[in-house]
Amino acid sequence: MTHPRTCLAIGLAVLGIAPAIHSQPRQPPDPMKAITTSFNNVHKNLLEMAEDFPADKYGFKPKPEMRSFGEVLVHVFSGTTYAAKAGRGEAVQWNELDPKSYVDKAAVVAGFKKAIAEADATLKATPSTRFAASPEPWLSVIEHSAEHYGLLVAYYRLNNLVPPVSRPKK
C-alpha cells in the first residue's frame, strides 16, 4: 500500500517542478552572433562547393538561359562584396561583378575567398549594437546566398554529383 502512495507522491512532485523548469525565461539569441553564425555557415558551404565542383563543369548550365555554375558563384560573391561595403557604411549600389573577369575555377574560388574575408572583417568590426538596430545588409545577403546554395545543389545533382554537405561523414 505504501508503494502506490510513494509513486503518487513522486509523480506529483515531478509534476509540480516541471512547470517551474519550463517557465524560466530563455535569453533571446544575440543578434550579432546569430547573423555572424548564419553568414559563416552559408558561405562555408558555398565555398566548399566552389572548391569541390569539377573545374571542367564550371560552365555547366541546366538550361541555356541560366547562369553557369561559375557565374552563379560570381553572382553570389557580388552580393557578399556589396554587404561588406554597405556594412561599413559606404554608399554603395549593387554592382554585379563580371563573370568573364573570372576565367576559371581558381579565379572564382580566389574571388569568393576574397569577398568572404572582406565581409568577415566588416562583421568583426561592426559593434553588436548595430545589429540590434537593423540586421541589414547581412540578413539580405544571407538569404540571397542561401537561395543560390539551394540552386547549386541542383547543379550538383544534375551532374550526378553529391553536394559536400550531403555526403556521409567520415
Predicted regions and their residues:
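Well-ordered alpha-helical scaffold segments within catalytic/enzyme domains
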Residues: 45, 49-50, 84, 118, ...
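Short, contiguous alpha-helical
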Residues: 36-40, 44-47, 57-96, 132-170
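Bacterial N-terminal signal peptides that target proteins for export
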Residues: 1-10
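Acidic/histidine-rich, surface-exposed loop or edge segments in extracytoplasmic proteins
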Residues: 25-30, 89-101
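N-terminal beta-strand motif that seeds the catalytic metal site of vicinal oxygen chelate
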Residues: 27-39
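N-terminal signal peptide c-region/cleavage motif recognized by signal peptidases
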Residues: 18-20
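Acidic/histidine-rich alpha-helical segments that form the ligand environment
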Residues: 38, 100-145, 149
